[in-house]
Swiss-Prot record:
Interacts (via UL20 interaction region) with protein UL20 homolog (via N-terminus); this interaction probably plays a role in the coordinate transport of protein UL20 homolog and gK to the trans-Golgi network (TGN), and is required for the cell surface expression of gK. The lineage of its organism: Viruses, Duplodnaviria, Heunggongvirae, Peploviricota, Herviviricetes. Belongs to the alphaherpesvirinae glycoprotein K family. Glycans are attached at residues 57, 89. N-glycosylated. It comes from the Viruses. InterPro entries: GK. The keyword Glycoprotein applies. This is Envelope glycoprotein K. Residues 1-31 form the signal peptide. GO terms for cellular component: host cell endosome membrane; host cell Golgi membrane; host cell plasma membrane; membrane. Glycoprotein that probably modulates membrane fusion events during secondary envelopment of cytoplasmic capsids that bud into specific trans-Golgi network (TGN)-derived membranes.
Length: 343
C-alpha cells in the first residue's frame, strides 16, 4: 500500500528508520563509564534552585538532601534509581559541614538522569512513535489518492491498485477460474465521482469541506497525523538540550540535528514541489463479468474471500510485529538497564 506514496514522504520514512537503527546501535554499543548526570548544589545551599547539572566525578562526595529522595528531579526513563548508589545519607550532612577538608568536595544531589536509559526509554520511543504515526499518515494519504478528492489531480492513483481489488481479481482467477470485474468497475465509478468532487474542491475548498463533513474529518485526520509525526521528529532534537548532552559524544548530537534538518528539508521540498501530470495514463474498464447464478456466486465468494484474506494478513502482521517487539524489547531493556521500579 505504501509503494504508491510520494518519493518525498517515503524518503522521510526511510530517514526515520535509519535514525532509529542508529539510535539502537549507539545505545547497545556505547561504552559509557558512568551513564548518569547529577543536578547538584553546594552543601551550604538552602534550596535546589541554583542546581547545576554535571557529569559524575569520582573526587566528589554525593549526598542526599536533608528531606530525602522526595526532592529528587528524575527523568522520564524510570531507571534513574541506578544513579543513586553509594551516596552519603542525609543524616550525615551536619558532620560533613564541619569537616573542612571535605566541605568543598560535598555536593547535595537534587536530581539525576540515567542517560543510557534516556536513549532507550525516551528518545527511541519518540522515534518509534514518529515512525508509526508517519506510516498511518501515508496509509491515510494513500487511501485519499485512490478514492478521495485532491485539488491537484496529478496526485490521483489508479483505483485498480486498491488492495481488495487485486485480492478479488487474484482469488477469482486462481481459485474460481473465472474473471470477476464488478469490483473493478465499482472502483472506476468511484474514480469518476472523485474527479467531479476534486473539481469542486479545487474551485471552492472551504465550501466543499463545509458541505462534506466526512471529507473534512478524513482530511483533518490525515493532516493531524502528519502534523503530530512532524512534532515528534522535531522533538528528537531535545537530546541536544537535555542535561545528558554533556555525556553524549559530538557525533550523536550532530546526527540528531542532521536527522531533523534532513527531514525538514524533504518536507519543505514536498510542499513546494508540484507533482507533474502523468503521461499516457489511461484506465480502460475491464471486460464485463459473467452473469447469472455463476456470476452471483463468483461475486459473493470473491468479495468475502478477499476481505477475509486481507484482514487475516493484516492481523497476522500486527500480531507478529507486536510479539517480536515485546519479546526482544523487554530482554534488551533488562540487559541494558536492569529492572525498573516503575514496572
Amino acid at each position: 500500500m505504501l509503494l504508491g506514496g510520494r518519493t518525498a514522504y517515503l524518503s522521510v520514512l526511510g530517514l526515520i528508520t535509519a535514525y532509529a537503527a542508529f539510535t539502537i546501535w549507539y545505545t547497545l554499543t556505547a561504552q559509557l563509564h558512568n551513564p548518569c548526570v547529577y543536578a547538584t548544589v553546594s552543601i551550604d545551599s538552602k534550596d535546589g534552585i541554583a542546581a547545576k547539572w554535571e557529569v559524575y566525578n569520582s573526587t566528589i562526595v554525593y549526598a542526599y538532601p536533608e528531606n530525602g529522595a522526595k526532592r529528587f528531579s528524575d527523568g522520564l526513563s524510570g531507571f534513574d534509581y541506578v544513579c543513586r548508589e553509594n551516596w552519603v545519607n542525609e543524616s550525615k550532612l551536619d558532620v560533613l559541614k564541619n569537616m573542612k577538608e571535605l566541605h568543598d568536595k560535598v555536593r547535595i544531589v537534587v536530581g539525576t538522569r540515567n542517560c543510557r536509559a534516556y536513549l532507550w526509554s525516551v528518545q527511541l520511543q519518540m522515534i518509534t512513535g514518529a515512525w508509526l504515526i508517519y506510516i498511518a499518515f501515508l496509509c491515510l494519504r494513500q487511501e485519499r489518492r485512490l478514492l478521495g478528492p485532491f485539488r491537484n489531480q496529478n496526485e490521483f492513483l489508479s483505483p485498480t491498485g486498491y488492495t481488495f481489488n487485486y485480492a478479488t481479481y487474484t482469488l477469482a482467477t486462481t481459485v474460481l477460474k473465472t474473471h470477476y470485474t464488478k469490483f473493478a468497475l465499482l472502483l472506476c465509478e468511484a474514480s469518476l465521482r472523485r474527479v467531479a468532487l476534486s473539481r469542486t474542491f479545487k474551485r471552492d475548498p472551504i465550501g466543499f469541506l463545509c458541505e462534506h463533513s466526512a471529507a473534512l474529518a478524513l482530511i483533518g485526520l490525515e493532516v493531524g497525523t502528519h502534523f503530530v509525526a512532524r512534532l515528534l521528529v522535531v522533538g528528537t532534537v531535545t537530546l541536544v538540550h537535555t542535561p545528558c548532552s554533556q555525556i553524549y559524544p559530538i557525533y550523536l548530537k550532530l546526527a540528531s540535528w542532521g536527522f531533523v534538518v534532513a527531514v525538514t528539508i524533504v518536507e519543505i521540498v514536498a510542499i513546494i514541489y508540484e507533482k507533474p501530470p502523468k503521461t499516457g495514463s489511461s484506465a480502460n474498464p475491464p471486460t464485463p463479468a459473467t452473469h447469472g447464478v455463476k456470476g452471483l456466486c463468483t461475486s459473493c465468494c470473491s468479495t468475502v474471500l478477499a476481505n477475509l484474506c486481507g484482514k487475516l494478513v493484516y492481523l497476522l502482521l500486527v500480531i507478529g510485529a507486536v510479539s517480536i517487539l515485546l519479546h526482544y524489547e523487554q530482554r534488551i531493556q533488562i540487559g541494558l538497564l536492569g529492572e525498573s521500579f516503575s514496572s
